[in-house]
Structures are given as C-alpha cells and as structure tokens.
Amino acid sequence: MSAAIVNAVKQCGYFNQGQCLSCRHIQQPLAQQVAVKTQTLQQLLAPFIPANSAELFLPPITGDDSGFRNKAKMVVLGAAHEPVLGIVSPSGEAVDLCDCLLYPGDMQALLHRLTRFVQQAGLPPYRVDKAKGELKFILLTRSQVRGEYLLRFVLRSHNGIERIERELPALLAEYPQIKVVSVNIQPIHMAILEGDEEIFLTENTRLEERFNHVPLFIRPKSFFQTNPQVAAQLYQTARDWVAEFSPRSLWDLFCGVGGFGLHCASNDITLTGIEIEAEAIACAQMSAQMMGLENVQFMALDSTDFAKGKSAADKPDLIIVNPPRRGIGEALCQSLSEFAPKAILYSSCNPKTLAKDLEHIQGYHLTKVQLFDLFPHTDHFEVLAMLVKD
C-alpha cells in the first residue's frame, strides 16, 4: 500500500468538511483500525477461548484502504437540470459523492457521467419532503474481472423509463463495459432501497465476477461482497479450512450466490446450498453449471426451515453458515447441535451475534478464528470461525 494512497484517504474532503461521516475512522492509520477491531473480536469471543489459546486467533487479513469498493448506492438529489448523486449531509445538504475515494477511478468517472445522463434525460429526482419526482437512487456495481458494470435506476413509477431508454444508447456506446441495465420500481414513500418489480433494459441480466478462478454472478437483487480484494482471500481461506476435513457432503446455509460452497465444491463432494433470495440461487446455479459440477443442489428456501425439516440421518460432514447481521438464531443453533457434523464453518459480519450464537451451539469448540477487514474506516469486519465437534 503506497503512502500516497494512505495520505489521500486520510485527507478525504467529505469527512474533513463534515459532509459524509460514513468512514468514521478514516483519520486513523489502517493498522490502528485493525488493532482495535482485533481487540473487540477477542473480547467478544473470550468466553469461548480456552486459557492459553491465543494462537487460535490468526493474523488479520487486510487490503487496500481506498479504491476497493465495487458498489455505489447513490441517492439522487437536486433537480432534473442540476442533479446530485450522493447523500444528504448531517446538516441536510445534498452532497455529490462521485469522487468518494473508496471507489476505483473508472467508477468515479462513470458516476460523473451518470450525473450528466440524469440531466440529459430530464429525470426529476424524487423529493422526499414533497413526495414528488421520479428518480430515487442510482445503484452501480463493478466487476473486477473486466471492469464491467451493472447499472440500476430506482424509480417511483414507470413514467421515467422512456426517458432512460431514449438516452441509454449513447451511454452504452460511450461505456460498452456497462453490461446490465435495469429499472427497479419502488412506489412507496418510505426509506426503502428497492421494490419488487425489476425491468431489464439490456439483453444481459447478470454480471460475471471471478474469485480464485471460481465464476460468480451478480443479479440486481442478489447480495454480493463489496470488497472483492479481501473477499477473495476470505473465500480462499474457507476453502483451505474445509479441505482439512475432506468432507464428502456439505451444506452451505445462507449461501447467497454460492461463494463459499462453490469454492469448496468438487464432483467428489455433495453440496447443498440454501438461500432465501431466489435471484441469488439462480446465480449460484449458473456458476455450478459453468464449473461442470454434478453433485450440487441450490434451493431458494429459508435456512432455518430447511434445517428443521431434516433429520440427523441427513446430516452432512460439514456445514457452512454465512448469515446476515442478525446471526443464525437459537433455533438453527439447536438444529446444528443436533445434527452434530464434524465441523461448522461460521462466517460472520457481526461478531456480537456470532458470540450470541456460540452460546447456543452445543458440543463444539473453536479451533481457528480470523478477522477479514472488508470494511476499512468503519467499525465493521468479517470473521471466519471454525468449530469442531468435541
């Protein structure tokens, strides 16, 4: 990491001027940030770590502290003739965040171009205070493989679609790396990012990403890690840890687009992936097909309900869980304890709920814990924890 990059991030004008405070720790050296996160993690997991077992905590994994983020969620503010893509500042002002240093340079340039696109299309930004206007958000996702993009316009109604379609050919001619464009209709006057209806304006409906030679796909509503550099190391570490157990059968619960399970999969392993979001399951199925995997099944189901419907005889050798911030919950903890697989690999984006879940998983002990700093300058981080049957 170059000194220039570190200094550039520390001199973030948005933060210094109080316009954006999302990166609350940006003025601290990255090493100091990670040290604080490590201490927080160790304190939360201390009740589950035997005495003199500090070696269970492996060195934290970090990446670049700028230019790493692959997704932008821009509120569209201002007026049709002078739109602003960004956020509302703590003082209530519209702040243009196109130059946010978390985004790669090519992404910053495209965000500026999208500002002009909104102006040229004459799309009136949605005014929350007046419940008027059309364009609520612009959501942009970047693939690191070829620098390709998925672009979404979140509208209040169908009224703005014709204007988008009118200006879209010129945008795609200028930016052929935009592979997927869609409109999401969100008619509700509430702080909700997206609605149920998705309308594709391109033939392509998915964006390809690739981690460690594993193809993964992104669709508009499927969750995907926002820091690909560190996420690739997270998936590779999971693959290495799982391989130590030589499992013949594997469950990947809360599997999303299949990142963990597909990294561990082979035709010698029976893999079952469970995820509530149907779009994510469709992506996982595409990946499995592209990889030529035969003993793989991905299903759009609730992970807790899936586990409740299984008996101990159905248990796999190893179970991976990668829940949202709320954790897996007491009911699923009980199911995992009853299944008693050889090991449980828990990937958590919230160490507080990880610790809470560990209280309810019976008959297991931690053997490895590692912190992955997917979210520099914030209090958030990812944790990989290996639990082995007593």
UniProtKB/Swiss-Prot annotation:
Keywords: 4Fe-4S, Iron, Iron-sulfur, Metal-binding, Methyltransferase, rRNA processing, S-adenosyl-L-methionine, Transferase. S-adenosyl-L-methionine binds at residues 225, 254, 275, 322. Belongs to the class I-like SAM-binding methyltransferase superfamily. RNA M5U methyltransferase family. RlmC subfamily. Disulfide bonds: none annotated. One of its GO terms (biological process) is rRNA base methylation. The active site is at residue 349. Its EC number is 2.1.1.189. It comes from Shewanella baltica (strain OS185). InterPro entries: 23SrRNA_MeTrfase_RlmC, MeTrfase_TrmA_AS, MeTrfase_TrmA_CS, SAM-dependent_MTases_sf, U5_MeTrfase_fam. The lineage of its organism: Bacteria, Pseudomonadati, Pseudomonadota, Gammaproteobacteria, Alteromonadales. Catalyzes the formation of 5-methyl-uridine at position 747 (m5U747) in 23S rRNA. The gene is rlmC. GO terms for molecular function: 4 iron, 4 sulfur cluster binding; iron ion binding; rRNA (uridine-C5-)-methyltransferase activity. It catalyses: uridine(747) in 23S rRNA + S-adenosyl-L-methionine = 5-methyluridine(747) in 23S rRNA + S-adenosyl-L-homocysteine + H(+). The keyword tRNA processing does not apply. This is 23S rRNA (uracil(747)-C(5))-methyltransferase RlmC. PROSITE patterns: SAM_MT_RNA_M5U, TRMA_1, TRMA_2.
